[in-house]
UniProtKB/Swiss-Prot annotation:
It comes from Sus scrofa (Pig). InterPro entries: IsoCit/isopropylmalate_DH_CS (IPR019818), Isocitrate_DH_NADP (IPR004790), IsoPropMal-DH-like_dom (IPR024084). Plays a role in intermediary metabolism and energy production. It may tightly associate or interact with the pyruvate dehydrogenase complex. Homodimer. Residues 1-8 form a transit peptide. It comes from the Eukaryota. The lineage of its organism: Eukaryota, Metazoa, Chordata, Craniata, Vertebrata. This is Isocitrate dehydrogenase [NADP], mitochondrial. The record marks 148, 220 as: Critical for catalysis.
C-alpha cells in the first residue's frame, strides 16, 4: 500500500509556481476544503500561499489578511478565492466584530485593479429562461466611477446648477450650466478617468483573446456624446494599436454597440461572446444574464487585470448561509459546489498557461468536463434539480443528491476520467 501511495504521489502534476488561496466563510468554506483535499491536491502538486479570509480572521487581523492576499496575488499572478461574508449590522452582532469590515472583493479589486468577468457554466439538461443561449455569454463590468462615485443632491428651491472644472495648471476655469431650476428637483455630477477606461479596455481585449470569442462594448454615445464617446474612442484606439492583429489571427472581432441595440441582440443571440459594459449597465445586465442562464450556482467570476497576466477566480455566489445553518444543526444539505470547483479550475488553467504546463491545463479542463457531464448524466444538487422539475416536486436521492454524495460522485468520475481507478 505504501508503494502504491508513493507511486500515486509521483503521478501528481508538478506546478512550478505558487497559487494564492483565499479561504472563505460558512457553507462554501466547508465545500472549499473538500474540493481542495479530494479533487485538487490528490492530482496536483502545487504550492498554495494560504490566506484565511474567513470573517473571524479578517476581524482578528483588522482586515490586513485581505490586503496581504491581494499583494500576494500581485506577486504570484494567480489566486483562487472562496466566497466570503461582507458584514452588515446583523453580522457585526453575530461575530462580535470590532467594526463593519468592507467587502473583501472590493478591497482586492481596489489593489489589483482589473475587471470582473462573470461566465455561466452550461449543462444541456438544465433549462434556461432564454433557451437560445446555448453558448456562454460573459459580461465584463467596468467597476469604477460613473453613478457609483457620483455626487448627487436634492434641490429644494429655484436656482442654477453649474459644473465647474478648475485646471491644476492655473489656467482659467471652465464652467457649464446644467440646468436652471424653476423649483425643487435633483442633480448629479459624475466622472471617469482615461486611465481606468484604458485598464478596462485592456482587460476586456485580453479576456476575449484568452477565450477566443468576439468582444462587444456597449454605451449610449448618441446621447452622452462626450462622456460615452470617450469610452468608445479609447476602446477603438487601444484595439487598433494593440489587439487587432491577434483578433484577426483568431478570426474574432471587436465592435462598439449602442446599449439598446446590444440588449436586443443579446436576447436573440446563441451566445459565445464577451460583452464589455459600463459600471451601471454591467451591474444590471449581469443579473439578467445569471437568471437567463438558470442558476447562480453555475456562475463563475474571474477578476482579470489589465496586464492580462494577473487573475483571481471565484464563484459568483455568496456563502450559502441558509444551508450553513442546517449544517450547523447536523443536517445534510444539498449545496451546489460547481462554481467553487470552477474557481479552482480557472485559476489552475491560468497558472498552466503562464507556466506552459499542458498537463495542468488538461487536468483543469478535465475536471470542468467531469462536473458538466456528471450533471448531464442526472446526478445533481437540489438547486439544479429544481430548475428541471420545480423545487416543490424534487425528492432526495430520486432527483438530487446531498452535498457530500454529489462531491463523491464527482470525485469518482474524475478519478475515472484521469484513469486513476
Amino acid at each position: 500500500a505504501r508503494a502504491a501511495a508513493r507511486h500515486y504521489a509521483d503521478q501528481r502534476i508538478k506546478v512550478a509556481k505558487p497559487v494564492v488561496e483565499m479561504d472563505g466563510d460558512e457553507m462554501t468554506r466547508i465545500i472549499w476544503q473538500f474540493i481542495k483535499e479530494k479533487l485538487i491536491l490528490p492530482h496536483v502538486d502545487v504550492q498554495l500561499k494560504y490566506f484565511d479570509l474567513g470573517l473571524p480572521n479578517r476581524d482578528q487581523t483588522n482586515d490586513q489578511v485581505t490586503i496581504d492576499s491581494a499583494l500576494a496575488t500581485q506577486k504570484y499572478s494567480v489566486a483562487v478565492k472562496c466566497a466570503t461574508i461582507t458584514p452588515d449590522e446583523a453580522r457585526v452582532e453575530e461575530f462580535k466584530l470590532k467594526k463593519m469590515w468592507k467587502s473583501p472583493n472590493g478591497t482586492i479589486r481596489n489593489i489589483l485593479g482589473g475587471t470582473v468577468f462573470r461566465e455561466p457554466i452550461i449543462c444541456k439538461n438544465i433549462p434556461r429562461l432564454v433557451p437560445g443561449w446555448t453558448k456562454p455569454i460573459t459580461i465584463g463590468r467596468h467597476a469604477h466611477g460613473d453613478q457609483y462615485k457620483a455626487t448627487d443632491f436634492v434641490v429644494d428651491r429655484a436656482g442654477t446648477f453649474k459644473i465647474v472644472f478648475t485646471p491644476k495648471d492655473g489656467s482659467s476655469a471652465k464652467q457649464w450650466e446644467v440646468y436652471n431650476f424653476p423649483a425643487g428637483g435633483v442633480g448629479m455630477g459624475m466622472y471617469n478617468t482615461d486611465e481606468s477606461i484604458s485598464g478596462f479596455a485592456h482587460s476586456c481585449f485580453q479576456y476575449a483573446i484568452q477565450k477566443k470569442w468576439p468582444l462587444y462594448m456597449s454605451t449610449k454615445n448618441t446621447i452622452l456624446k462626450a462622456y460615452d464617446g470617450r469610452f468608445k474612442d479609447i476602446f477603438q484606439e487601444i484595439f487598433e494599436k494593440h489587439y487587432k492583429t491577434d483578433f484577426d489571427k483568431y478570426k474574432i472581432w471587436y465592435e462598439h454597440r449602442l446599449i439598446d441595440d446590444m440588449v436586443a441582440q443579446v436576447l436573440k443571440s446563441s451566445g459565445g461572446f464577451v460583452w464589455a459594459c459600463k459600471n451601471y449597465d454591467g451591474d444590471v445586465q449581469s443579473d439578467i444574464l445569471a437568471q437567463g442562464f438558470g442558476s447562480l450556482g453555475l456562475m463563475t467570476s474571474v477578476l482579470v487585470c489589465p496586464d492580462g497576466k494577473t487573475i483571481e477566480a471565484e464563484a459568483a455566489h455568496g456563502t450559502v448561509t441558509r444551508h450553513y445553518r442546517e449544517h450547523q444543526k447536523g443536517r445534510p444539505t444539498s449545496t451546489n459546489p460547481i462554481a467553487s470547483i470552477f474557481a479552482w479550475t480557472r485559476g489552475l488553467e491560468h497558472r498552466g498557461k503562464l507556466d506552459g504546463n499542458q498537463d495542468l491545463i488538461r487536468f483543469a479542463q478535465t475536471l470542468e468536463k467531469v462536473c458538466v457531464e456528471t450533471v448531464e448524466s442526472g446526478a445533481m444538487t437540489k438547486d439544479l434539480a429544481g430548475c428541471i422539475h420545480g423545487l416543490s416536486n424534487v425528492k432526495l436521492n430520486e432527483h438530487f443528491l446531498n452535498t457530500s454524495d454529489f462531491l463523491d460522485t464527482i470525485k469518482s468520475n474524475l478519478d475515472r476520467a484521469l484513469g486513476r481507478q
